[in-house]
Amino acid sequence: MQKFTVHQGLVAPMDRENVDTDAIIPKQFLKSIRKTGFGPNLFDEWRYLDAGFPGQDPASRKPNPDFVLNQARYKGASILLARKNFGCGSSREHAPWALDQFGFRAIIAPSYADIFFNNSFKNGLLPIVLPEAQVAQLFDEALAFPGYTLTIDLERQVIVKAQGEELPFDVQAFRKYCLLNGFDDIGLTLLQSDKIKAFEAQRLAGKPWLSHTVAG
């Protein structure tokens, strides 16, 4: 998992409440057994005017010119600004995968659905919670100023505006540790590899028959 320490990025404002996971990545794209390839279909039914299907070349699609992520001023955005209850709906982990693979490193919103919130941390995506009034102010600024960027300093737990104003945010200590070090669940398990090897050796010594294979 990619480490998250300090990130400066262009902000894309998605001015919708209750954005659900089916909007983030529609169900027809969940058939893949791989964890990659979801970025091109992020917000698929909003980004395109035609219906999409798995394996389709995005270049052949008809983009919706009114959708925020299709507007030139937000091309390359890596910070998504959202309204309350972002990520509601079903518990599909594909939602943070799609956001990450599209290029987003962080989301800023007043609130999130619990499962989406937890899944985001586990996949290297930082979901920041700010008071609704502060989020509204960020929307005003992002819409008013083309090229609007923010710097997110996870170590200090602050969002820094271009003029230097800082907005503090909370993050649970263990989640912060994992993001700063790039540890997903597998990475955390591998930190205990010496203990795992010692346990396996001890188990083999006490129960050697467990290592035997059955002839076919």
UniProtKB/Swiss-Prot annotation:
Its EC number is 4.2.1.33. It holds the Pfam family Aconitase_C. Heterodimer of LeuC and LeuD. One of its GO terms (cellular component) is 3-isopropylmalate dehydratase complex. Catalyzes the isomerization between 2-isopropylmalate and 3-isopropylmalate, via the formation of 2-isopropylmaleate. This is 3-isopropylmalate dehydratase small subunit. Belongs to the LeuD family. LeuD type 1 subfamily. The gene is leuD. Keywords: Amino-acid biosynthesis, Branched-chain amino acid biosynthesis, Leucine biosynthesis, Lyase. GO terms for molecular function: 3-isopropylmalate dehydratase activity. It catalyses: (2R,3S)-3-isopropylmalate = (2S)-2-isopropylmalate. InterPro entries: 3-IsopropMal_deHydase_ssu, Aconitase/3IPM_dehydase_swvl, AconitaseA/IPMdHydase_ssu_swvl, IPMI_Swivel, LeuD. Gene3D superfamilies: Aconitase, domain 4. GO terms for biological process: L-leucine biosynthetic process. It comes from Polaromonas naphthalenivorans (strain CJ2). Pathway: Amino-acid biosynthesis; L-leucine biosynthesis; L-leucine from 3-methyl-2-oxobutanoate: step 2/4.
